[in-house]
Amino acid sequence: MAVLALLFCLATFPSCILSQVQLKESGPGLVAPSQSLSITCTVSGFSLTGYGVNWVRQPPGKGLEWLGTIWGNGSTDYNSTLKSRLTITKDNSKSQVFLKMNSLQTDDTARYYCASVSIYYYGRSDKYFTLDYWGQGTSVTVSS
């Protein structure tokens, strides 16, 4: 009976399998120019071995900027313009994903978000995915 209920849930509401998903970012708040930024994203409600997690930021008054993704198998994709400064890692056992960015400048001031990937597919040369679950974000200011 429980199996039938689960199948009904999945068939009717595909997102129900991730209905309890939560993501929470924690960061330093203030970072001095030229220093490094480290942010942790702690997730619950799903396993990091089965889903990708993205890092996205939004500078004040500007749009969202994708930083990178770490996939369930541990492989990573990065924004090509920031790739040399970024490292994304994770600890599956602690359900945590880590963003490290080096050589910060004032234009790195932004709100930083982690977001989980629920659906993705490959195009001819690109990956496409939906970011259905977001953390509340953590504000980072780069200033001396």
UniProtKB/Swiss-Prot annotation:
Keyword set includes Glycoprotein: no
Note: The sequence shown is translated from a differentiated gene isolated from a myeloma that secretes IgG2b.
Taxonomy, superkingdom: Eukaryota
GO biological process: immunoglobulin mediated immune response
Keywords carried by this UniProt record: Adaptive immunity, Immunity, Immunoglobulin, Signal
Any one Gene Ontology molecular-function term assigned to this protein's record: antigen binding
Pfam families (UniProt xref): V-set (PF07686)
Protein name: Ig heavy chain V region MOPC 141
Organism whose genome encodes this protein: Mus musculus
GO cellular component, one term: extracellular region
Signal peptide bounds: 1-19
Keyword RNA-binding attributed: no
